[in-house]
């Protein structure tokens, strides 16, 4: 299978796309064509998560032999998750289930792809017989950073540098990054938001700095979901959801199910859409936004407009206005690299673009959008705990609030089972979780965690609890205009080590 840029005719192999991350023209890599539907439940029901991952991903990385892919998924998913099923799907009622994606090393859904991605990248690097070092440059709105740092920690031949908004993540998320272990990692806060960090990194990928670094022996790549090595492993868990629902008799063999995804950078919900294209019987696919509702407005109007106030919310991983993976969705909807290139240029120049009526009819046939206010989010957290004895993090609560409102309005078929994607452990956000339980947060987030645990009986995950006594190793904060300089300094450090 070949991969091409969303903006031009640039074409590469899957292994080349893995290492490069971003196309030379600034576009994102997509398959030259998506695989035809190939999923048959009867053939898949007996598979473990790692076996299912190998089967599904072999259709997207067909330049990796089957036995090699099985070994990679086995190494990635063995002993790295707290539950044997990797992604437990918990039935809450006849109407809906929760797909828990927070049982990995950093308590967030990013662990599912970032446990495997380092293995894929190292494999691709070996196959290309390229002796250069790889520097992973990553922007994070909270969860990707820690998951990427943990995934690439001490991986030979690979280094990772993460940029996060210094005032835009939760205290626990910040501790996870600032207290990261490893001899090949670097963490830097920025004065700005996630869009600033991601936008600057995209410019770096198209700059002379990338060329200079390559001449020094350091290649740039990305661990954000702009990289196919992040995106396609996420497809697997939507297939897993389907099989889990069948095993639990939540749906019948010929029934569909709806999926609600709390959405920031659009990678997670795009993976759900791709899963549907290859045969997962997803009915309604719902994109849930928080107060930064640029996507919800797009689905309503057909216009993507970032000329608006940016809100710092209690669901920081969704505090994004420029959703990078939306570019891929536009490509699939329009089928035109010229249209995508023009829209992305308009977004850069004016902060706004609109789709044609024909394209929007296709979009609305594939996906719906909704949003939840901070009040609706917190009420959802309280109500679900009171009714179902289930504690949600704020991102999952946004998804539930959108689902609940759409269900009341009749926008979701009442007879169709719905899966809400639970993207992070609630204990990563102790302040808002405590408030939703009627508790007053303590000044120290770890004291707040203990208070929540005492009330709910839910143990503090080891991965979070052990942070309290660990020293902070990364406290640098730079202006977004200084990010390129910080990257070049780290490149020089890497070269000095070698």
Protein language model features and the residues they cover:
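PLP-dependent amino-acid enzyme catalytic core
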Residues: 1-498
